[in-house]
Every structure is written in structure tokens, then in C-alpha cells.
């Protein structure tokens, strides 16, 4: 049986590995899929009110395309977040280190080892990078998706039947942001 100190060290290592992995927590997944569903459903209003596609007659089409688009947009969120997280962590490292060191100096830090201080700084840096990368990923992908839908709908596919216009503009927009998100920028 492993000693308790080794078990604690293993759990700390697992937490660090989890922070740098591509896997999302349940909270992040819910946030991404919730936002992706909302932004994917917005074009329904556009096609219902402007292109006069009936809600009831097109309900199945709206549902299928919204679900497909939700998956692709959430996929783009995840990829962009992962790429940005490390860049943000590098840029914010000095500021986060100063803030954590200042807070620790205000508190009683004489009892704290250098390793524990470094772990707190790393944890805070990772938390800040995760938050900033998540919010920027959602903002960037939502903006790009909605701009692509509007451009495709009103300019590129304006002479198509509204049903074909909807299918092509939603699938092309969500597919394009999912494709663009796979690049390493």
C-alpha cells in the first residue's frame, strides 16, 4: 500500500495533468453545449421571420440542424479554448505570480514552503487562463458563426429556396468554424 504522502502527491499530479488535458469538466461541457445550443437556435428566428419558413412545418429541419450545429460549435469552443489556454497562461504568468505572492505575504506565509507557494501560483495561473480562454472562445466562435450565417444567408445563398438556404448556411457556418478551430494558430 502506498504511503499517504505519495497518495497526496499523486492526486496533485492528477489535478495538474487534468488542467492541461483536452478533456472538459462537466461544468465546462454544460457551459459549451448550452451556449452552442443558444447560438445555433438564433438563426431559427431569422428564417422564421425574414425568410418566412413556417415554424411547425420546418420543426424537424430546425431541430436536426440546430443539434448538428450545436455539436460543431461546441467542438469549436473546446478546440479554441485549448489552443488559447496555454497562450493566456504564458502572458498572465507574471501578473498572477505577483498577485498570489502579494496575497500570501499579507497572510501568514512563514509556514508555507516554496514548493507550496509555487503550486498555488501554478493553480491560480491555470484558473485565470482557463476562465479567459473559455470566455474568449465562446465570444470568438459565436461572433464568427453568426457573421457567417448572415453573410451566407443574405449574400451568398440569397437566390436559393429558404429551406436549402437554411441547410447550407447553417451547415457551412458551423462546419467552417469547427474546421478553423482545429488549426494551431
From Swiss-Prot:
GO terms for biological process: SRP-dependent cotranslational protein targeting to membrane. Residues 49-54, 158-163 are cytoplasmic. The chain crosses the membrane at residues 28-48, 55-76, 136-157, 164-184. The modification N-acetylmethionine is found at residue 1. It holds the Pfam family TRAP-gamma. The modification Phosphoserine is found at residues 7, 11, 105. It is a multi-pass membrane protein. Belongs to the TRAP-gamma family. Heterotetramer of TRAP-alpha, TRAP-beta, TRAP-delta and TRAP-gamma. TRAP proteins are part of a complex whose function is to bind calcium to the ER membrane and thereby regulate the retention of ER resident proteins. This is Translocon-associated protein subunit gamma. It comes from Rattus norvegicus. The gene is Ssr3.
